[in-house]
């Protein structure tokens, strides 16, 4: 028995969950999905938190559901001991069976998160609409390669990251980014 953490939901695009879960089942692995950038992303019509043994989300200020700091773990496996971490490893009063940590969010960041839940779905739908526009227009540009979502996925589009083949363009990367910024499309070099 073991576990595997899947950290490939970068930019809000779900991975091929069917393939990962098949491998996990074959090797008797627990799967923990890192969905820090994938709030509201879906795979085969289900929210991504429905898959694996656990799913983690980040509420850092730059995320789609940012509260300043904090996060959340959803669990699909009753045997998974998330409660140990929440309660400092305490299973019974004064009985600690594992090392625990205090990662509780404070009331203020919790209230910010609850208030932002009201706008998360419409904001995600807006991101999806913008991503569709980007996809239709980027496909016509030689040398610019857009992200292609995994079959069956409905991304949350935390970021829309393109790969640019500078040899195919007649400008530098900085000139390309400046032209996009001038048109109201913010750009940045990440990672």
Where are these regions (language model features)?
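Active-site phosphate-binding strand-loop segment of PLP-dependent enzymes
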Residues: 1-67, 72-74, 79
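PLP-dependent aminotransferase class I/II
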Residues: 6-8, 13-20, 26, 42, ...
């Amino acid at each position: 028995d073991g576990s595997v953490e899947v950290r490939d939901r970068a930019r809000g695009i779900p991975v091929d969950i069917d393939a990962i879960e098949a491998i996990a089942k074959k090797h008797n692995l627990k799967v923990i999905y890192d969905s820090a950038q994938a709030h509201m992303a879906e795979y085969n019509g289900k929210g991504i938190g429905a898959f694996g043994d656990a799913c983690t989300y980040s509420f850092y200020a730059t995320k789609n559901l940012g509260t300043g700091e904090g996060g959340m773990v959803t669990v699909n496996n009753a045997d998974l001991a998330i409660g140990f971490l929440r309660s400092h490893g305490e299973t019974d009063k004064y009985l600690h069976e594992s090392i625990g940590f205090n990662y509780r969010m404070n009331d203020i960041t919790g209230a910010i998160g609850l208030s932002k839940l009201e706008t998360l779905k419409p904001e995600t739908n807006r991101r999806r609409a913008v991503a569709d526009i980007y996809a239709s227009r980027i496909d016509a540009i030689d040398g610019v390669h857009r992200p292609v979502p995994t079959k069956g996925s409905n991304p949350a589009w935390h970021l829309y990251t393109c790969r640019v083949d500078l040899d195919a363009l007649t400008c530098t990367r900085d000139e390309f980014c400046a032209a996009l910024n001038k048109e109201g499309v913010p750009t940045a070099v990440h990672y």
